[in-house]
A protein has these predicted regions:
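Glycine-rich, proline-tolerant flexible connector loops at the mouths of alpha/beta enzymes
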Residues: 9-12, 32, 60-71, 123, ...
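Conserved, mostly hydrophobic/aromatic
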Residues: 22, 61, 115, 145, ...
Length: 308
């Protein structure tokens, strides 16, 4: 469908502050052992300028879930990026928000939103998240995003604690019904400062099989080869691409902050995972017969469009 094109997205991890306490995540609210940070608007724009110079035409702003009082600042940041880079796509991955906040981000210039549901089985969801978090609200957020007009991404964590094959089948069927433009998935990786520290990581082969299933079921979807794959195995990203992924997201975040955005242990953020390593990434992809595309790669009307 895409020939040998792999789309690149510049990832900017804007904050590791989070109001949630998900049992699997290293930036959960109750983790007192990490230094919290939040990028100022000027720092985010600086990352975008560097990314644009390197050839990125999509920026992904990802961060822990912030309280509603921060929404106004995000609206201003999105508007500033849109004004400075009118030819670029802006993707947000900021968790669950009010419908009004999603609408304001969209009107300010955001095009895409990533919100992985992680699992659509109610019982399993409650084994991964504290009682105050709600699967039904998360799924409602996905519906809002679609109704507003975003290109929407959702997805799963493979091999999370207590996950069964039946849960994965439910996820496959949910994603088939929802028809997202983007499908994000990666293996569960434990973090030492979480309740799931002693659980084993998700299985690489199962992750790759699921990636291939999603590619066959959703031929036009944008599916990233995730950092988690590259963390699990040195050739994880290449194997993800060979299994059907068509997006990679090198890290544009300020290098001195990257280690603090520690969702799981030993997270890959250097070498080809970093934006500075774009040449290395291009070499690695060339080695398996693929090339980096600097096009935006928008998904419109059920088709992927690759011209700017």
């Amino acid at each position: 469908r895409f020939g040998n094109k792999i789309f690149i997205r510049g990832l900017i991890e804007i904050t590791n502050r989070c109001r949630n306490n998900c049992y699997y995540c290293g930036i959960r609210k109750e983790n007192r052992n990490i230094v919290r940070y939040e990028l100022a608007q000027e720092e985010i724009l600086s990352c975008c300028h560097e990314g644009y110079r390197l050839g990125f035409r999509t920026f992904v702003l990802q961060g822990g879930e912030a309280p509603a009082v921060k929404d106004e600042g995000m609206v201003e940041t999105v508007a500033a990026i849109r004004q400075s880079f009118p030819d670029c796509a802006i993707t947000l991955s900021l968790g669950e928000k009010s419908r009004e906040a999603y609408e304001r981000f969209f009107l300010a210039g955001a095009n895409r939103y990533l919100l992985r549901h992680e699992t659509c089985n109610e019982g399993h969801y409650h084994r991964l998240h504290p009682a105050e978090m709600s699967l039904s609200h998360r799924l409602r957020c996905l519906d809002w995003l679609k109704e507003i007009g975003y290109q929407v991404g959702t997805g799963i964590m493979v091999g999370s604690p207590y996950q069964t094959v039946d849960h994965l089948v439910e996820d496959i069927l949910f994603i088939e019904r929802f028809q997202p433009e983007m499908i994000g998935m990666g293996p569960f990786l434990p973090h030492h400062d979480t309740p799931f520290a002693s659980f084993p990581p998700g299985d690489m082969e199962l992750t790759l099989k699921l990636l291939s299933i999603f590619r066959l079921m959703h031929p036009a979807a944008l599916i990233p080869a995730t950092t988690a794959l590259a963390t699990l195995a040195p050739d994880g990203r290449e194997r993800g691409i060979l299994a059907g992924a068509n997006v990679v997201m090198p890290n544009l975040s300020p290098s001195h902050q990257r280690a603090k955005y520690s969702l799981y242990d030993n997270k890959a953020s250097a070498g080809a995972e970093a934006a500075e390593g774009l040449l290395k990434l291009e070499e690695q992809l060339k080695g398996i017969g693929y090339e980096v595309s600097r096009e935006r790669g928008d998904y419109e009307n059920g088709e992927l469009t690759v011209d700017n």
